[in-house]
């Protein structure tokens, strides 16, 4: 059983990524066999290796395609909305994270510690996400929403830690009230806002000064 009749190579790849995302989220990286993914996608094992170099490559491919990207989706839907408002919206959602994509990132992070086939692609994936977030922070700094004296890279790293942590510390392990969490987020946003001194001095974002 190779490629399904009437299905393009791109469609076959999409089917494999969907099947892989579901399998890894449900059974974990170690508990999922390539044969399981192939069977779920309705193709042969050979069809997988026509598109992906390894099981680890398939995991990171599934994460890129089906991993949660709510911030990017919100930004694309409303690019004129303030970035700090977008961050607050995502931040309020984090403690309630219970979707399959959350399990997918956990599996990828755990597998990356044990399997170099996963570690390399995951470094690339995290680097891409960090770069995108840092770019967003630079825009927020230029728009006067975030203190330009702060490192955009450090701000991006902070956001990544919150997002990854929310996938690990689920509400069934530790819950927090919506009101108290929102109050904390508002305090954090206020803390990274431009100081009066920097606003008056017109300090440039760090990423633009280097």
Identify the residue ranges that each predicted region occupies.
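Short hydrophobic/aromatic patch on the recognition helix
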Residues: 41-52
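Alpha-helical DNA-contacting segments of helix-turn-helix folds
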Residues: 59-66
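Basic, helix-initiating cap at the start of DNA-binding domains
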Residues: 1-27, 31-43, 57
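Helix-turn-helix/winged-helix DNA-binding modules
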Residues: 28-29, 50, 147
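Hydrophobic alpha-helical connector segments
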Residues: 61, 72-102, 152-159, 182
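Short, solvent-exposed amphipathic helices
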Residues: 100, 121-128, 132-135
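Amphipathic alpha-helical segments used for helix-helix packing
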Residues: 97-120
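Hydrophobic/aromatic-rich alpha-helical bundle segments in the mid-to-C-terminal region
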Residues: 119-123, 127, 141-192, 196-210
